[in-house]
Design a protein with these regions (language model features):
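Boundary regions of SH3-family modules and the immediately adjacent low-complexity/disordered segments
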Residues: 1, 53-81, 92, 104
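Extracytoplasmic
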Residues: 7-10, 45-49, 60, 74-76, ...
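Gly/Thr-rich phosphate-binding beta-strand-loop-beta motif of the actin/hexokinase/Hsp70
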Residues: 88
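SH3/SH3-like beta-barrel superfamily modules
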Residues: 30-68
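Glycine-rich catalytic cores of cysteine/serine-nucleophile enzymes that process amide/ester linkages
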Residues: 97-107
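Beta-loop motif signature
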Residues: 1-41
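Exported/periplasmic cell-wall-interacting domains
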Residues: 69-77, 106-113, 125-203
Length: 203
């Protein structure tokens, strides 16, 4: 993944790895909440450009950014969401640190099968951004989106892993696509999850 340098307030995107191929839309920094903009990379790069996955619909949209605008990093922490078993598995390298039951999207707004990174971290006690109690006290925003919704609450329909104040629904299909965890489980995951943590949602 790549983290935008703090002195770059707006990350310019390019359609191809050429200076003249500027796209109209870029990405603000910080974003999407607090914290430096963090984007998923594809592994493709040139001397001056790096290809990224842009956090827009449709999922998998790519663009190029200038190498000088970002720093590359990697994480050995991985969250696997198993939709069939409705559980989240936290890995550090090859070691399983915790397995946790989760609630997932309902039949109308299913949780999509995608790979993503954590591109936003939100903690109720530390943030000026208000989210309803339904989100619990902690949220890991993801770089991919619901494939059933065009927007959600006036924003892009980004997926997230978050806590909940309705733990009785853990293990069910009830959400708009997000993954819900018990407060205890998401607090444990938060000890290891950082911006750039990989998330793999499996069928």
């Amino acid at each position: 993944y790549a983290i935008v340098y703090p002195e770059i307030p707006y990350l310019q995107l390019f359609q191809t790895p050429k200076e003249g191929a500027v796209l109209r839309e870029g990405l603000t920094n910080p974003g999407p909440f607090e914290g430096l903009r963090t984007v998923e990379t594809t592994g493709r790069m040139t001397e001056d450009f790096i290809e990224i996955v842009v956090p827009v619909k449709p999922n998998g949209t790519t663009a190029w950014v200038l190498t000088r605008d970002v720093s590359l990093s990697e994480s050995d922490v991985l969250i696997v969401i198993d939709l069939s078993d409705r559980k989240a598995i936290l890995y550090e390298g090859e070691n399983i640190l915790r397995e946790a039951p989760v609630a997932i999207g309902d039949k109308e707004t299913p949780t999509p099968v995608v790979d993503a990174i954590v591109d936003a971290l939100w903690v109720r006690s530390e943030s000026d951004i208000y989210l309803a109690p339904l989100y619990g006290n902690r949220l890991f925003g993801l770089s991919q989106h619901s494939e059933a919704l065009e927007h959600f609450g006036g924003r892009r329909p980004a997926l997230a892993i978050h806590g909940t104040d309705e733990v009785e629904y853990i293990g069910t299909e009830i959400s708009n696509g997000c993954i819900r965890m018990t407060p205890a489980d998401i607090d444990f995951f938060a000890q290891y999850v950082t911006l750039g943590t990989r998330v793999s949602i499996l069928p």
